C-alpha cells in the first residue's frame, strides 16, 4: 500500500505541472484560467505541508495547509463559474470558507477533535464541488463541447462522493483515539481514492481551456470575417452532416433544389453584408 508521502506528493506534483500548463495559456484570455492557476498553486503548497505534522507547529503543519485547501476549493469553483460566463457567488462562498477556517482552528487549539475537523473540511469541499459541477453543467456563453464539460462535472461529482464517504466514515469515530484514526484501514483507502481523483480534478481545466480555444478557432474559420455569415465550406459540411448523401435514384431533384436554393440564399446574404460594410 502506498506510503502517506507518495499519496500526498503525487497530487502536489500534478498540481504543479497543471499550474505551468495553465500559465502557458494565460494569454488566451479564456475566463477562469487565473482562478484555476492560483487554485493549483495553493494545492501544490498545501499538500506537502501536511507531511510535517510532527516537525512543525500545528499552526503551520495542520491549520495553514487546510486553510490553503479551503481557498483552493473556492478558487476552483470560481474558475468554473467564470469559464461558463457567470460570476462566482462570493457573498455565500466567502463567509462559508471563513466559518470553516474558524471552526477548524477551534477544533485544533480549543478542543482537539479530529473527526470534527475532517467533517468540516469534507462537507465544505463537497459543497464547493457540487457548485462547480452545477456551473459546468450549465450552457456556456462561448461555443464549447458539452462532452468535456460533462466529463469535468462527472469528475467533480466523483470527488464529491469521496469527500462525503470520508465525512460519513469519520462521523461516528471516537475522538479520543487521536491520530490513530488516520491510520485506520478505512481512512487509508479513502485517502488513496481521493489522491487518485485529485489529479483528474486538477487536469480538468486544461481540457476545458483547450476545448474552448479549439471551438473559437473553429468558429473563426467557419465564419466570414467581414459579415460574420457562415462560410461556404462550413455550410457544405453542415448540410452533409444533417442530410447524409443518398443514392441518385432516391435523392431525386428535391434534394438538389434544396441545396441550390440554400446556397443561393447564403450567397445573397454574404454579398449584401459586404455591400453594407463597404457603404
Indicate where each model-derived feature is located.
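Short aromatic-rich membrane-water interface segments that cap or initiate transmembrane helices
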Residues: 1, 184-194
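Catalytic-core segments of nucleotide cyclases and related cyclic-nucleotide turnover enzymes
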Residues: 249-278
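Hydrophobic transmembrane alpha-helical segments in integral membrane proteins
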Residues: 1-15
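Active-site-proximal structural segments of metal-dependent nucleotidyl cyclase/transferase enzymes
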Residues: 237-255
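Juxtamembrane segments at transmembrane-helix boundaries
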Residues: 16-33, 47-181, 198, 204, ...
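Conserved nucleotide-binding and Mg2+-coordinating catalytic segments in signaling enzymes
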Residues: 218-237
Amino acid at each position: 500500500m502506498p506510503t502517506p508521502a507518495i499519496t500526498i506528493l503525487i497530487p502536489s506534483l500534478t498540481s504543479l505541472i497543471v499550474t505551468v500548463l495553465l500559465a502557458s495559456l494565460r494569454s488566451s484570455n479564456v475566463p477562469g484560467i487565473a482562478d484555476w492557476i492560483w487554485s493549483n498553486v495553493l494545492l501544490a503548497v498545501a499538500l506537502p505541508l501536511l507531511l510535517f505534522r510532527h516537525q512543525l507547529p500545528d499552526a503551520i503543519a495542520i491549520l495553514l495547509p487546510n486553510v490553503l485547501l479551503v481557498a483552493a476549493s473556492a478558487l476552483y469553483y470560481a474558475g468554473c463559474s467564470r469559464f461558463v460566463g457567470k460570476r462566482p457567488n462570493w457573498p455565500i462562498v466567502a463567509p462559508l470558507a471563513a466559518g470553516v477556517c474558524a471552526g477548524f482552528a477551534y477544533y485544533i487549539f480549543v478542543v482537539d477533535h479530529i473527526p470534527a475537523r475532517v467533517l468540516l473540511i469534507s462537507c465544505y469541499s463537497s459543497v464547493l464541488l457540487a457548485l462547480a459541477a452545477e456551473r459546468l453543467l450549465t450552457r456556456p456563453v462561448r461555443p464549447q463541447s458539452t462532452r468535456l464539460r460533462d466529463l469535468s462535472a462527472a469528475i467533480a461529482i466523483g470527488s464529491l462522493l469521496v469527500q462525503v464517504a470520508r465525512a460519513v466514515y469519520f462521523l461516528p469515530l471516537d475522538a479520543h483515539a487521536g491520530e490513530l484514526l488516520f491510520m485506520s484501514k478505512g481512512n487509508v483507502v479513502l485517502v488513496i481514492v481521493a489522491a487518485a481523483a485529485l489529479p483528474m480534478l486538477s487536469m480538468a481545466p486544461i481540457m476545458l481551456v483547450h476545448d474552448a480555444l479549439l471551438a473559437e478557432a473553429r468558429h473563426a474559420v467557419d465564419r466570414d470575417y467581414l459579415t460574420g455569415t457562415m462560410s461556404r465550406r462550413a455550410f457544405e459540411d453542415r448540410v452533409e452532416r444533417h442530410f447524409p448523401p443518398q443514392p441518385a435514384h432516391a435523392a431525386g431533384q428535391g434534394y438538389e433544389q434544396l441545396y441550390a436554393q440554400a446556397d443561393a440564399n447564403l450567397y445573397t446574404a454574404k454579398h449584401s453584408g459586404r455591400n453594407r460594410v463597404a457603404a
